[in-house]
Amino acid sequence: MKAAVYRSYGPPEVLKIEDVEKASLKDTDEDRVLIKVRSSSVNPFDYYHRMGFLPVRISNGFITPKQQIMGIDVAGTIEAVSKNVTKFKVGDRVFGSCLGSHAEYVRARQSAIAVIPNNITFNEAAVVPCVALSAVQAIKDVAQVKKGQKVLIIGGSGGIGHFAVQIAKYYGAEVTAVCSTSNLGWVKDIGADHVIDYIKQDFTKNGKKYDVILDASAARTFFSCKRSLTENGFYMTENPTKPGFQLFQVLLGSLTRDKKMKGVGLTKTGGENL
């Protein structure tokens, strides 16, 4: 099969389209499915892995990447199932998150995928998993947003951000989204109670306080947002592995036991949340 492969870390030039051994189910697989990939997407996750930033190298190899096929989001049809798979059958249209999805075939756990709704195309489904699951984990699992809380989402028109706006609104929060001028209207249409044009206004200087600040674009530091938090509020960044101050501030928060600071990444690829 053909796949997008990187055998060393670096710029886009390290990516090559190569013929590699076709992915297949193993005799030891119990809960895996084989997916014929119809569509995939590109996320910051892929960029950080290809470039080989330090947090990535800790898990994926310091010199040479262990996982050499790119991709995490997938949409396609099930080609085969292992013995204990009960939720899916051959031919099902599915989407989800699994490593190595920039290829013609990929193995995935049944717990990491879901059936694509009939009114959704493969291309539309492929852009959902990573960003939507990250937003769910931030708003539902980490922040545990409740009705009446004030939530600020930086990057409210981005991939993670626009899902976070809708999810926070679903849980009854009063949602403020920060985005650019051209996106103010549609971000309000999808559920934001208030919108702030970051080009014209700095939310840290308007005197308002929020129970939760989610930086979905890693555009601001915790330290710059701290004065905009309520006494028991906290800040989350969706890109804790971003080079520079973001990783430093998350580590500092852990070392100082500062409960106001949390780094959130895609840690669970649960299909039930899709």
Describe the predicted segments one by one.
Residues 23-41, 54-100:
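Glycine-rich beta-strand-centered segment in the early N-terminal region that forms part
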Residues 95, 196, 213-214:
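N-terminal Rossmann-like NAD(P) cofactor-binding module of classical short-chain dehydrogenase/reductase
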Residues 48, 63-73, 80, 93-155:
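NAD(P)H dinucleotide-binding glycine-rich loop of Rossmann-like/cofactor-binding domains
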Residues 125-197:
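Mid-domain Rossmann-like dinucleotide-binding core that forms the NAD(H)/NADP(H) cofactor-binding site
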Residues 204-212:
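A short acidic, Gly/Pro-enriched loop at the edge of an enzyme's catalytic core
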Residues 219-274:
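Glycine-rich phosphate-binding loop and adjacent beta-alpha segment
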